[in-house]
């Protein structure tokens, strides 16, 4: 028998005054997973976090945490701790006292406090910083103190509210790796809220993408990136090229002949379509292949010209206008040993992709 989820939100509705920000919202999170709630500003992700923490109450629905209905429990009675974006460290206290604060409030014995704080600081690699004050710490160190203060209480779930957004890019990348390693080491459930797609993809076991208070898709980072449910998910997670097409006929299970941009081409889909169905063929920039027009192979593809090119060190990114007028993005890994691996502005090119790399969804109006 499989274990029940550590956290379940069932048919949650939340209103602020007359505005309904969540309606019939459902979510299940497994014990011990790193789960990220991802979406643009105003999508409802922070509201979900606050409902889990107990900082807000749901107008309708139920929240189950570790088998207990906590819908009516106050925040301090829930086995949950939150790491805020600001870290919320007490400036007049040492690192040790900041981490020990929750245990002291819970009237834990002094010997146990000392042992648990020592263990928590060792976990986040700050054992030598116990006597320092917050102003003597770097941004990354403050982040780790905030996490130590949260995990020292041994919560079932740790909530992190955009807690890396204040860090610079390189430190943020470093902390992404450290957070994931720490989560594995602790074995507790992390629920992370962010608008940053890179953070979500790099750290998470699973990701929930939200928009306008609705769950758009839940899946692994790879599922979210490679097999988006709809155009919002496809466009919110990285760059995407969208080609309109119509199913001409079914060739076999999940293989179809499609008409697109003046030619017919075989496509592969992970769902069933009928002849005449309008579809979107989705391709990431890195899925496209570019050739000089005069070197175009003898198979269906797009012709166009290069509008802009950008060398990033690892890739050569090209903006291409197709004959249809549509503008697309293509990204190819740079090959310094290929003297022809470059394109000039207005260069005539031919664009293709490897069969099976496309993702096909029902057309949206």
Swiss-Prot record:
Localisation per UniProt entry: Cell inner membrane
The name this protein goes by in its record: Spermidine/putrescine import ATP-binding protein PotA
Primary location: membrane
Oligomer and partners: The complex is composed of two ATP-binding proteins (PotA), two transmembrane proteins (PotB and PotC) and a solute-binding protein (PotD).
Keyword ATP-binding tagged: yes
Superkingdom to which the source organism belongs: Bacteria
SUPFAM superfamilies on file: MOP-like (SSF50331), P-loop containing nucleoside triphosphate hydrolases (SSF52540)
Organism annotation: Hahella chejuensis (strain KCTC 2396)
Reactions catalysed according to its record: ATP + H2O + polyamine-[polyamine-binding protein]Side 1 = ADP + phosphate + polyamineSide 2 + [polyamine-binding protein]Side 1
GO cellular component, one term: ATP-binding cassette (ABC) transporter complex
